[in-house]
Regions:
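Active-site rim helix/loop that mediates acceptor-substrate recognition in acyltransferases
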Residues: 28-49
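Acyl-donor binding region in acyl/amide transferases
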Residues: 71-124
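A residue-level signal for beta-strand positions that form part of recognition/binding surfaces
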Residues: 1, 75, 130
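Conserved donor-binding loop and adjoining core beta-sheet/short helix segment
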Residues: 45-87
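Short amphipathic alpha-helix that is part of the acyltransferase structural core
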Residues: 1-34
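Charged/polar, solvent-exposed surface patches and flexible loops
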Residues: 14-21, 25, 38-42, 94, ...
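Conserved catalytic-core motifs of GNAT/GCN5-like acyltransferases
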Residues: 115, 128-137
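Short glycine-aromatic motifs
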Residues: 47-48, 125-128
Length: 137
């Protein structure tokens, strides 16, 4: 059974060797020229939040995001999202509602947003807005 866990900032260095390649895998598709090492400090200082999905003690997916304050609304913006296999999104998404979605709601977010490739937008059945998908909470 897959389970999602929010990694406390103090524990990130312990898992970094396993998490870093997954973050880089997600970021390689962006235009921002950002890599996992660029995001380590924001994760450790609590600006970004790192979720892992574990299956039988193996990290199979990561989700990295941060809060974005707009004049009238607040979002949880997902910076990086990847599975180790490149598949298993259905199984990972089963953990998403009880973890990332609840986390965003508890923290006063009105929606979740993520910039994704078109294929993932279609698979998630989220609103595709120029590859920026949103989930209203």
């Amino acid at each position: 059974i897959m389970e999602a866990h929010l990694i406390p900032p103090k524990d990130v260095p312990e898992f970094w060797y396993e998490i870093k390649p997954l973050i880089d895998k997600a970021l390689v598709h962006g235009e921002e020229d950002v890599n996992a090492d660029d995001l380590l400090a924001p994760i450790i200082n609590g600006k970004c939040f790192l979720w892992i999905v574990v299956n039988d003690l193996e990290i199979v997916s990561i989700c990295l995001g941060e809060f974005c304050e707009y004049p009238r609304k607040k979002s949880f913006y997902i910076n990086a999202w990847a599975t180790k296999s490149g598949y298993e999104y259905d199984e990972v998404m089963e953990t998403f509602n009880g973890s990332v979605v609840n986390f965003a709601k508890i923290n006063g977010c009105d929606f979740i947003e993520a910039k994704v490739r078109k294929g993932l937008a279609k698979k998630l059945k989220w609103n595709d807005k120029h590859s920026l998908v949103t989930l209203t909470l």
